[in-house]
């Protein structure tokens, strides 16, 4: 599995050219993309500026001497490469298993090209088997939790080391065990209207390309948006 992730990450790095502003994703597959960018800077003299999607990726990039700017210091991002936890046939996805969904969506939005790197196990017919992360402000989080409970969404606060997990933006995450999401676009809109919700892990029709590593090698699928 790790080898598949590495293949996808290295393939994605081919889309990065000199002079670009590059969004560095977060997660186990995006990790290999960041490593490959670091190698190209060191060995090939690749010249880019990068923006990161989490404190974890920032630390990795700094260790590789990748030049960084904050998202507010750039007007746009040429290409962002990130992982995904699930991807359906309509190019909708669930992200946020690593807890970085808010920053990931903030960086993805001004990106001219948005690419996901996944192994074939992440491809699904319908989203929902992977718990859907919802980032909520700490104030009133229990109110939001109870609202989700009443709706039958089987919520649970994400924890780390026996404490509630706190994101880089100092918010909590409520994971929803939905099993299947019949209409990701409508459900995303519903969550957008819940007071106290900062962001959710549904990335609907945002991605341009999905790079999939599997037993038959690396395949690249392009969405309608990316054509």
Swiss-Prot record:
Binding-site list for substrate: 26-29, 82-85, 95-98, 122
GO BP terms in the entry: pentose-phosphate shunt, non-oxidative branch
Pathway noted in the entry: Carbohydrate degradation; pentose phosphate pathway; D-ribose 5-phosphate from D-ribulose 5-phosphate (non-oxidative stage): step 1/1
EC number(s) reported in the record: 5.3.1.6
Pfam families: Rib_5-P_isom_A (PF06026)
Keyword line: Isomerase
Keyword Isomerase attached: yes
Molecular function GO labels: ribose-5-phosphate isomerase activity
Catalytic activity: aldehydo-D-ribose 5-phosphate = D-ribulose 5-phosphate
InterPro entries: NagB/RpiA_transferase-like (IPR037171), Ribose-5P_isomerase (IPR050262), Ribose5P_isomerase_typA_subgr (IPR020672), Ribose5P_isomerase_type_A (IPR004788)
EC primary class: isomerase
Active site: 104 (proton acceptor)
Known partners and oligomeric status: Homodimer.
HAMAP family: Rib_5P_isom_A
Function: Catalyzes the reversible conversion of ribose-5-phosphate to ribulose 5-phosphate.
Family the UniProt entry places it in: Belongs to the ribose 5-phosphate isomerase family.
Designated name of the protein: Ribose-5-phosphate isomerase A
Organism this protein belongs to: Streptococcus pneumoniae (strain ATCC 700669 / Spain 23F-1)
